[in-house]
């Protein structure tokens, strides 16, 4: 019989088997049918990890087998299952750039916001891969776009690092943080400059990337663009920096105020200074001090030699504190220079130069106070003047070391105290080394600052030359003069710095040989003071000249910008004015030509009247009746012609009135500058109608003129006929010639006028087209006055209605905001409930697995119970056999008793027989009772087995029942062992 462990041993479903190997191979080959058949087999699971931590589900996502993924999901695979590195299938699909797999997984409710062990979402991997479709899908399914991984990278930074500009554009359009930083403080703009992607840099700048941000090492985007050596990116950044600087120029006085506030705050709360050591004196720092300070006599118990009075000593200490405050303020300004970007250094340098000038003035005031207090303190004054010069030098340097300034300032500002003759050489060596280190630092920083200044000046000169080429020659000459002056100031500044370095070298030599060459230092004192003063003056002049030159350059730049703006704004206005003037001149010319034509028409009418008069005078009084009829016909024709002429004159007057109205409207339009499109169309329609009428009038005039000519010819014929009868030939010829000449002149004039009129009509058409285009361009944005007056009342009512609607919409918006907040809270609660449901589902799944295991155990126990029932049935059969044997023995005993009774009856007494019979009867009763009890127990056991079997089939076995079954099995085992 099997052991109890073998009965209750549960099969380990997580063990790797052959089916799992086959499943991996099928997924590798992309065989969806084989995957489906293998998943139906026992022990095969798509989320089971192999030795490398890989699963079949993740392999399908990595290979991009969509059909395999479908089959696995339909077989109940957990979509959120992770591999050994915490990647879900969505992470793997995004990492390998399979948008179809991503779409399917998102359809199967795979969460897009899940992160792996490195804190990355699927969007991080899609951005790193540069797959635009994958990025779009994940953004549509609300993947967090500004979530940082463990390295501090958001998807935008990852896309920029890998140079995927399209993904960067998409992420920026969907709300990615432009100024987000990683662990090292680098922004997306810095990374784009480092990779040399000009398109990405342009997109980031357009989206508002901050160019003044620096990383943890203090480098800005311009530094990274220099590393990539991309000139296009550098020019782009410099142009943006210059634009920002132009926008910030009005706020420069505020910056100056802020710097002054910082310096005042620092001066208001001075730092604690360490007292200088007693052996150090001003003679150890400069050879300009007097040898009187180096004496072998010890200090007196009250005061020093130079500062004998207590108030004077207090004032000197206050001066020293002021100097320390000033040095602190300059150090603060230097720290501002270190923090600021390269583009703002020039502006801050101007502010600091102004600050240097104020500091020198303050030093001069302090020197004047010292001179007023004690005329004997020339050595202290020389020290103070040298200290002021040193402060100007530190202010002009871009970022001098604070540690190198503190000992020098303390040593220089210390009062000249006498020291004993036994000064140690170690202190002098330490001071010399400190001064040498500070000098080296100053030289390096001066060189770096000069290089940066040259770069900035070259860039400024290039920009200025580009802008100044557009301007006149005067500005270019001024710019060249200013550049020459700047170069001269730079050369002066360099010469001054060289002289300062030579003086400092002489100071070092004086420090090394101060004990042996006191007389030499005394001789060099006066020229050193003079050199320092001259250098100070030269330096101040150079600084002032450079400031003036910069101011002039800025003024010229502002003037140039104003001129460019004026030139940019002027041409359209001038063009409009020229068009208006040309249009007005054309209209005036047309009116003049019409007046000229009207005059010509009147002249022609006068000539016709004259001809009629001459005809009347020349007609004979004794004319026949036919001539009277002809006269009447001619008079009728003349009347008709007069009527037509009057009608034409009326039409002309109407056209002239319309022209005057049009002129008035045009003047009103010019006063109002523009008209509405509808009004313009109406005016154009009126002008077209007037032009059509004028053309019709002209055509009618031409037709009438032709009729008049025809009539004139007829009249001439009649006159000729009459003249043949009555008038002389000479007069007739003269009249004919005059008429012909006048007719020819009239025809020539008419032809010239028609050609001129055609040209003018073409010009009018061109001008009308131009005017229509201009007014169409302008009228879209203008409102007509007529419609404005009509719509004003309606608009006011609409405004009131809209105001009420706006109030209602504001209320509704507030309600909507509250509802949105409620919805958000409900969504958060729903998410929490979803998480709780997921946890409950996981717990239920665990319970289901436990129940399945229990069911398997119950099945095994049922099998054991069946075996036990078989054994119990065998036991019952054995018991039945025993009972039968017992009954047989009882019968045998009865027979024996009967035989014994017969024998005993014959041999023994009756009393003994009765006792034996009683004993045998008692034994028989006991055996019968035992049989009945065995049957009852057997029935009870069978009923219990049946009940437990039913519970096991229904899956409702209790722990107590399991314990009882185990006990039964142990009992059966013990019984079998006993047998």
Curated annotation (Swiss-Prot):
Q: List the keywords (alphabetical).
A: Acetylation, ANK repeat, Cell junction, Coiled coil, Cytoplasm, Cytoskeleton, Differentiation, Nucleus, Phosphoprotein, Repeat, Spermatogenesis
The modified positions for Phosphoserine read 11, 281, 286, 293, 300, 304, 318, 327, 329, 340-341, 358, 513, 516, 667, 694, 914
Chain span(s) of sequence motif Nuclear localization signal: 270-276
Record-level GO cellular component terms: anchoring junction; cell cortex; cytosol; fibrillar center; mitochondrion; nucleoplasm; stress fiber
| InterPro entries named among the record's database cross-references | Ankyrin_rpt, Ankyrin_rpt-contain_sf, RAI14/UACA
Kindly indicate whether the keyword GTP-binding belongs to this entry. Answer: no
* Coiled-coil residue spans: 349-374, 430-943
Give the superkingdom in one word: Eukaryota
Q: What GO molecular functions are on record for this protein?
A: actin binding
Q: Where is the segment annotated Disordered?
A: 247-299, 392-429, 446-467
Q: Which residues fall in a compositionally biased region of kind Basic and acidic residues?
A: 247-259, 446-457
Which residues are recorded as modified (Phosphothreonine)?
Answer: 249, 295, 297
The ANK repeats extend over: 18-51, 52-81, 85-114, 118-147, 151-180, 184-213, 217-247
The biological processes this protein is annotated with in GO are: cell differentiation; spermatogenesis
Quote the function comment for this protein.
Answer: Plays a role in actin regulation at the ectoplasmic specialization, a type of cell junction specific to testis. Important for establishment of sperm polarity and normal spermatid adhesion. May also promote integrity of Sertoli cell tight junctions at the blood-testis barrier.
Official protein name in the record? Ankycorbin
